[in-house]
Amino acid sequence: YFTTPNQMKSFFATPQLNDYWAFSDGLCSVPNFQDFLPLKILQEHDKIPGGTFIINGQTGDYISGGHIPEALMAPSISADILFSAIIGKHFSLWKSLKTPKTLNEIRAELATRFKITFSKNIDREEAIAIYERFEYEERQAKYVINGQRNYELLGLNWVLPFWESDVVNFWRDVPIEAKFQQKLYRNTVDHWNYRGIFRDIKTTVGHWPGIRKLILG
Protein backbone atom coordinates (compact mmCIF):
# COMPACT_ATOMS: atom_id res chain seq x y z
CA TYR A 1 0.00 0.00 0.00
CA PHE A 2 1.31 3.43 -0.92
CA THR A 3 0.48 6.64 0.90
CA THR A 4 0.05 9.94 -0.89
CA PRO A 5 1.98 13.12 -0.05
CA ASN A 6 -1.23 14.68 1.27
CA GLN A 7 -1.88 11.71 3.56
CA MET A 8 1.63 11.92 4.94
CA LYS A 9 1.37 15.69 5.42
CA SER A 10 -1.90 15.29 7.31
CA PHE A 11 -0.41 12.52 9.43
CA PHE A 12 2.31 14.88 10.64
CA ALA A 13 -0.37 17.07 12.22
CA THR A 14 -1.99 14.26 14.24
CA PRO A 15 -1.35 13.26 17.87
CA GLN A 16 -0.57 9.75 16.64
CA LEU A 17 2.76 10.90 15.23
CA ASN A 18 3.80 12.25 18.62
CA ASP A 19 2.61 9.01 20.22
CA TYR A 20 4.80 7.04 17.85
CA TRP A 21 7.82 9.24 18.44
CA ALA A 22 7.45 8.88 22.22
CA PHE A 23 6.96 5.11 21.90
CA SER A 24 9.88 4.47 19.56
CA ASP A 25 12.43 6.92 20.93
CA GLY A 26 15.43 5.01 22.26
CA LEU A 27 17.66 8.06 22.76
CA CYS A 28 19.95 6.84 19.99
CA SER A 29 18.38 7.93 16.68
CA VAL A 30 15.46 9.74 15.16
CA PRO A 31 12.37 7.48 15.01
CA ASN A 32 11.99 5.32 11.92
CA PHE A 33 8.32 5.46 10.93
CA GLN A 34 8.32 4.68 7.21
CA ASP A 35 5.92 1.72 7.54
CA PHE A 36 3.62 3.17 10.18
CA LEU A 37 1.08 5.14 8.13
CA PRO A 38 0.53 2.54 5.36
CA LEU A 39 0.02 -0.21 7.96
CA LYS A 40 -2.27 2.00 10.02
CA ILE A 41 -4.45 2.67 6.97
CA LEU A 42 -4.53 -1.03 6.09
CA GLN A 43 -5.63 -1.82 9.65
CA GLU A 44 -8.38 0.79 9.48
CA HIS A 45 -9.69 -0.94 6.33
CA ASP A 46 -9.51 -4.41 7.94
CA LYS A 47 -6.86 -5.54 5.46
CA ILE A 48 -4.54 -7.09 8.07
CA PRO A 49 -5.93 -10.30 9.62
CA GLY A 50 -5.47 -10.98 13.32
CA GLY A 51 -2.32 -12.89 14.18
CA THR A 52 -0.44 -11.54 11.16
CA PHE A 53 3.35 -11.56 11.32
CA ILE A 54 5.18 -8.80 9.47
CA ILE A 55 8.38 -9.96 7.75
CA ASN A 56 10.51 -7.33 6.06
CA GLY A 57 13.86 -7.64 4.32
CA GLN A 58 15.99 -6.00 6.99
CA THR A 59 18.80 -6.21 6.60
CA GLY A 60 19.62 -8.64 3.83
CA ASP A 61 21.56 -6.27 1.60
CA TYR A 62 23.88 -5.26 4.44
CA ILE A 63 24.76 -8.71 5.78
CA SER A 64 25.25 -10.16 2.27
CA GLY A 65 27.89 -7.55 1.40
CA GLY A 66 25.82 -4.97 -0.45
CA HIS A 67 27.25 -2.05 1.51
CA ILE A 68 30.95 -2.82 1.02
CA PRO A 69 32.46 0.11 -0.95
CA GLU A 70 34.81 -0.53 -3.85
CA ALA A 71 37.36 1.80 -2.26
CA LEU A 72 38.01 -0.83 0.42
CA MET A 73 38.71 -3.70 -1.97
CA ALA A 74 42.41 -2.88 -2.45
CA PRO A 75 44.83 -5.23 -0.61
CA SER A 76 46.01 -2.41 1.66
CA ILE A 77 43.92 0.55 2.82
CA SER A 78 45.05 3.84 4.32
CA ALA A 79 43.26 5.20 7.36
CA ASP A 80 42.13 8.22 5.33
CA ILE A 81 40.44 6.00 2.72
CA LEU A 82 38.63 4.04 5.43
CA PHE A 83 37.53 7.22 7.18
CA SER A 84 36.33 8.72 3.89
CA ALA A 85 34.26 5.61 3.17
CA ILE A 86 32.56 5.76 6.58
CA ILE A 87 31.99 9.51 6.40
CA GLY A 88 30.67 9.29 2.84
CA LYS A 89 28.10 6.67 3.83
CA HIS A 90 27.01 7.88 7.25
CA PHE A 91 27.89 11.56 7.68
CA SER A 92 27.06 13.18 4.36
CA LEU A 93 23.30 13.72 4.34
CA TRP A 94 23.40 17.22 5.80
CA LYS A 95 26.06 19.09 3.85
CA SER A 96 25.94 22.06 6.21
CA LEU A 97 27.21 19.86 9.04
CA LYS A 98 30.26 18.58 7.14
CA THR A 99 32.59 21.22 8.50
CA PRO A 100 36.34 20.66 8.94
CA LYS A 101 35.85 20.76 12.73
CA THR A 102 33.13 18.11 12.66
CA LEU A 103 35.03 15.85 10.28
CA ASN A 104 38.16 16.04 12.44
CA GLU A 105 36.12 15.10 15.50
CA ILE A 106 34.65 12.11 13.65
CA ARG A 107 38.07 10.95 12.49
CA ALA A 108 39.46 11.22 16.01
CA GLU A 109 36.54 9.23 17.42
CA LEU A 110 36.92 6.50 14.79
CA ALA A 111 40.68 6.28 15.34
CA THR A 112 40.21 5.90 19.09
CA ARG A 113 37.36 3.41 18.90
CA PHE A 114 39.01 1.10 16.39
CA LYS A 115 42.63 1.70 17.46
CA ILE A 116 43.62 2.98 14.02
CA THR A 117 47.04 4.54 13.47
CA PHE A 118 47.26 7.15 10.72
CA SER A 119 50.82 6.20 9.79
CA LYS A 120 49.98 2.56 9.07
CA ASN A 121 47.90 0.98 6.35
CA ILE A 122 45.20 -1.55 7.16
CA ASP A 123 44.72 -4.82 5.31
CA ARG A 124 41.50 -5.24 3.36
CA GLU A 125 39.81 -7.74 5.69
CA GLU A 126 40.37 -5.58 8.76
CA ALA A 127 39.27 -2.39 6.98
CA ILE A 128 36.02 -3.98 5.80
CA ALA A 129 35.43 -5.50 9.24
CA ILE A 130 35.76 -2.05 10.80
CA TYR A 131 33.50 -0.51 8.15
CA GLU A 132 30.78 -3.14 8.62
CA ARG A 133 31.06 -3.09 12.40
CA PHE A 134 30.57 0.68 12.45
CA GLU A 135 27.43 0.38 10.35
CA TYR A 136 26.16 -2.48 12.50
CA GLU A 137 26.62 -0.55 15.74
CA GLU A 138 25.64 2.93 14.60
CA ARG A 139 23.05 2.48 11.85
CA GLN A 140 21.58 -1.01 11.75
CA ALA A 141 21.11 -1.49 15.50
CA LYS A 142 20.13 2.08 16.32
CA TYR A 143 18.05 3.22 13.35
CA VAL A 144 17.17 0.51 10.85
CA ILE A 145 15.92 -2.06 13.36
CA ASN A 146 14.14 0.72 15.24
CA GLY A 147 11.63 0.45 12.40
CA GLN A 148 10.18 -2.64 14.12
CA ARG A 149 8.54 -0.25 16.58
CA ASN A 150 6.13 0.55 13.71
CA TYR A 151 4.61 -2.88 14.10
CA GLU A 152 4.66 -3.00 17.89
CA LEU A 153 2.67 0.20 18.39
CA LEU A 154 0.05 -1.15 15.99
CA GLY A 155 -0.11 -4.44 17.91
CA LEU A 156 1.39 -6.49 15.07
CA ASN A 157 3.77 -9.42 15.40
CA TRP A 158 7.10 -9.36 13.56
CA VAL A 159 10.14 -11.48 12.83
CA LEU A 160 13.53 -10.62 11.31
CA PRO A 161 14.75 -13.80 9.59
CA PHE A 162 17.85 -12.13 8.14
CA TRP A 163 19.05 -11.35 11.67
CA GLU A 164 18.73 -14.92 12.91
CA SER A 165 22.05 -16.11 14.34
CA ASP A 166 22.52 -18.87 11.77
CA VAL A 167 22.09 -16.43 8.89
CA VAL A 168 24.37 -13.79 10.38
CA ASN A 169 27.06 -16.36 11.21
CA PHE A 170 26.92 -17.74 7.68
CA TRP A 171 27.54 -14.36 6.07
CA ARG A 172 30.19 -13.50 8.64
CA ASP A 173 32.31 -16.38 7.32
CA VAL A 174 31.77 -15.78 3.59
CA PRO A 175 34.99 -14.58 1.87
CA ILE A 176 35.14 -10.88 1.00
CA GLU A 177 35.36 -11.60 -2.74
CA ALA A 178 32.04 -13.47 -2.59
CA LYS A 179 30.34 -10.76 -0.52
CA PHE A 180 31.48 -7.74 -2.55
CA GLN A 181 28.58 -6.44 -4.65
CA GLN A 182 26.55 -9.34 -3.19
CA LYS A 183 28.18 -11.75 -5.65
CA LEU A 184 27.27 -14.95 -3.79
CA TYR A 185 23.75 -13.76 -3.01
CA ARG A 186 23.03 -12.59 -6.56
CA ASN A 187 24.42 -15.75 -8.15
CA THR A 188 22.37 -17.88 -5.77
CA VAL A 189 19.02 -16.20 -6.35
CA ASP A 190 19.68 -16.02 -10.10
CA HIS A 191 20.24 -19.79 -10.17
CA TRP A 192 17.41 -20.62 -7.77
CA ASN A 193 14.89 -17.98 -8.99
CA TYR A 194 12.11 -19.26 -6.75
CA ARG A 195 8.80 -19.04 -8.64
CA GLY A 196 10.32 -16.46 -10.95
CA ILE A 197 10.36 -13.71 -8.34
CA PHE A 198 14.01 -12.78 -8.93
CA ARG A 199 13.76 -12.33 -12.69
CA ASP A 200 10.17 -12.09 -13.83
CA ILE A 201 8.66 -9.65 -11.33
CA LYS A 202 9.53 -6.04 -12.05
CA THR A 203 9.65 -3.56 -9.19
CA THR A 204 9.42 0.20 -9.15
CA VAL A 205 11.81 2.14 -6.96
CA GLY A 206 10.78 5.67 -6.11
CA HIS A 207 13.18 8.57 -5.76
CA TRP A 208 13.05 11.70 -3.69
CA PRO A 209 11.95 14.74 -5.71
CA GLY A 210 14.50 17.27 -6.89
CA ILE A 211 13.52 19.61 -4.07
CA ARG A 212 15.55 17.39 -1.71
CA LYS A 213 18.60 19.52 -2.54
CA LEU A 214 16.81 22.56 -1.19
CA ILE A 215 15.69 20.69 1.94
CA LEU A 216 18.99 19.00 2.73
CA GLY A 217 21.22 21.94 1.81
Q: Which residues make up each language-model segment?
A:
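ATP-dependent adenylate-handling active sites, centered on carboxylate activation for C-N bond formation
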Residues: 1-126, 147-198, 210-213
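Core structural elements
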Residues: 133-147
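Alpha-helical membrane-targeting segments
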Residues: 201-217
